[in-house]
Amino acid sequence: MDVTRLLLATLLVFLCFFTVYSHLPPEEKLRDDRSLRSNSSVNLLDFPSVSIVALNKKSKHISRKEAEKKRSSKKEASMKKVARPRTPLSAPCVATRDSCKPPAPACCDPCASCQCRFFRSACSCRVLSLNC
């Protein structure tokens, strides 16, 4: 009985090894440069060459300054977009994150809206967009 179990275990190991080995892609052995050129489907001369240039400290500072200028111009542009006249606040309104069940008045913040959950049982004023 032990011999048959040992034989079955050995057979199982060989089957596992054969299954794994059969799914591995075969390795191509290239003997020289000529076979590499004949087997490759893409010609390496078609691609442009790449040149590596070392940056000196002055060019690094210039690029940092340019990056800062770009960042500041983007911030200024976004600030210009955000600035818009706000409507005058009316006295009866609901503050942000306070309850605003349907008979309640509108939210005080013009960017906020009344959000209800659980079948309109829990409602609160929330700001949905950060750019507003």
Swiss-Prot record:
<dbReference type="InterPro" id="IPR036836">
    <property type="entry name" value="Agouti_dom_sf"/>
</dbReference>
<feature type="domain" description="Agouti">
    <location>
        <begin position="93"/>
        <end position="132"/>
    </location>
</feature>
<feature type="disulfide bond">
    <location>
        <begin position="107"/>
        <end position="125"/>
    </location>
</feature>
<dbReference type="GO" id="GO:0031779">
    <property type="term" value="F:melanocortin receptor binding"/>
</dbReference>
<dbReference type="Pfam" id="PF05039">
    <property type="entry name" value="Agouti"/>
</dbReference>
<dbReference type="GO" id="GO:0005184">
    <property type="term" value="F:neuropeptide hormone activity"/>
</dbReference>
<dbReference type="InterPro" id="IPR007733">
    <property type="entry name" value="Agouti"/>
</dbReference>
<feature type="disulfide bond">
    <location>
        <begin position="93"/>
        <end position="108"/>
    </location>
</feature>
<keyword id="KW-1015">Disulfide bond</keyword>
<feature type="disulfide bond">
    <location>
        <begin position="111"/>
        <end position="132"/>
    </location>
</feature>
<keyword id="KW-0964">Secreted</keyword>
<feature type="disulfide bond">
    <location>
        <begin position="100"/>
        <end position="114"/>
    </location>
</feature>
<feature type="disulfide bond">
    <location>
        <begin position="116"/>
        <end position="123"/>
    </location>
</feature>
<feature type="signal peptide">
    <location>
        <begin position="1"/>
        <end position="22"/>
    </location>
</feature>
<dbReference type="GO" id="GO:0032438">
    <property type="term" value="P:melanosome organization"/>
</dbReference>
<keyword id="KW-0960">Knottin</keyword>
<comment type="function">
    <text>Involved in the regulation of melanogenesis. The binding of ASP to MC1R precludes alpha-MSH initiated signaling and thus blocks production of cAMP, leading to a down-regulation of eumelanogenesis (brown/black pigment) and thus increasing synthesis of pheomelanin (yellow/red pigment).</text>
</comment>
<feature type="glycosylation site" description="N-linked (GlcNAc...) asparagine">
    <location>
        <position position="39"/>
    </location>
</feature>
<dbReference type="GO" id="GO:0005615">
    <property type="term" value="C:extracellular space"/>
</dbReference>
<dbReference type="GO" id="GO:0009755">
    <property type="term" value="P:hormone-mediated signaling pathway"/>
</dbReference>
<protein>
    <recommendedName>
        <fullName>Agouti-signaling protein</fullName>
    </recommendedName>
</protein>
<keyword id="KW-0325">Glycoprotein</keyword>
<keyword id="KW-0732">Signal</keyword>
<feature type="region of interest" description="Disordered">
    <location>
        <begin position="61"/>
        <end position="87"/>
    </location>
</feature>
<feature type="compositionally biased region" description="Basic and acidic residues">
    <location>
        <begin position="64"/>
        <end position="79"/>
    </location>
</feature>
<dbReference type="GO" id="GO:0042438">
    <property type="term" value="P:melanin biosynthetic process"/>
</dbReference>
<dbReference type="InterPro" id="IPR027300">
    <property type="entry name" value="Agouti_dom"/>
</dbReference>
